[in-house]
């Protein structure tokens, strides 16, 4: 991408159907967006998660925050849930998922299934159809996770949201010993 004077701004996706016309992947003009580039982005995101959070169940890829705009991938133990909200990144989704499985496997984490929850209305504004379903072989979509000593069953197929509301981590820690009446 270049500005009106031809000054290089970086590389990204342009979608004139979207309210967010441009989504930047890199601000460097010499960047080559290929599988190695995607793997490095995924690896950097995973290394950050390993350094900052409990990785048994977590948000592995958080869109723009990880310089992969328009895609969110949550990990629930050995299951991935993906939400793709931008046309450009949707086309890279198979590569992103392959690289993520590779990076996780290097840490001994084998993914048994991937479920896509790309059913948000915003996909229609991007010129994409809404989609919800398995990527690859079907599996039991009710996944048991343990967060801060509290066990949950997360329904990745029919749960309210594709994520687990990671914001409530501190609430769980604060109230995990309280009785509910």
Over which residues does each language-model region extend?
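Non-catalytic accessory regions of SAM-dependent methyltransferases
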Residues: 1-77
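Non-catalytic substrate-recognition/targeting regions of SAM-dependent transferases
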Residues: 63-74, 93-164
